[in-house]
Amino acid sequence: MSTEFPMRIGAEVALPALQGWNAAAGRDAIEKRYRFDNFNAAFGFMARVAMFAEKMDHHPEWRNVYNRVDVTLTTHDAGGVTELDVRMAQFMDEAAGRLGATGLPARADQPRT
């Protein structure tokens, strides 16, 4: 990755290009919850995304509980959402779709059980 930081575009600009993603509460970030058939599929998704993240040198904030993966994307160096986050979100949606996941918006009013 170059030494130049990506330009911040903000969640409000990024979200129209993405399906099922929401603005995170209290910060310039986007988030989504994926639900898979089982833990193996969820972990397989995370492994695939981890390899892509390493290539991009851009890493998600995420949490896995059984068949769910909750994801938050932001570019810390830029102080908010950038094109890197949009690219990562699009890759995640494609990878999740190949594994039969359903994407559920990760919202503060949804229980994270």
From Swiss-Prot:
GO terms for biological process: tetrahydrobiopterin biosynthetic process. Its EC number is 4.2.1.96. InterPro entries: PCD_sf, Pterin_deHydtase. Coiled coil: none annotated. Belongs to the pterin-4-alpha-carbinolamine dehydratase family. The lineage of its organism: Bacteria, Pseudomonadati, Pseudomonadota, Betaproteobacteria, Burkholderiales. It catalyses: (4aS,6R)-4a-hydroxy-L-erythro-5,6,7,8-tetrahydrobiopterin = (6R)-L-erythro-6,7-dihydrobiopterin + H2O. This is Putative pterin-4-alpha-carbinolamine dehydratase. Keywords: Lyase. It is an enzyme of class 4 (lyase). CDD domains: PCD_DCoH_subfamily_b. It holds the Pfam family Pterin_4a. It comes from Bordetella pertussis (strain Tohama I / ATCC BAA-589 / NCTC 13251). NCBIfam families: PRK00823.1-2, PRK00823.1-3, PRK00823.1-5. It comes from the Bacteria. The keyword Transcription regulation does not apply. GO terms for molecular function: 4-alpha-hydroxytetrahydrobiopterin dehydratase activity.
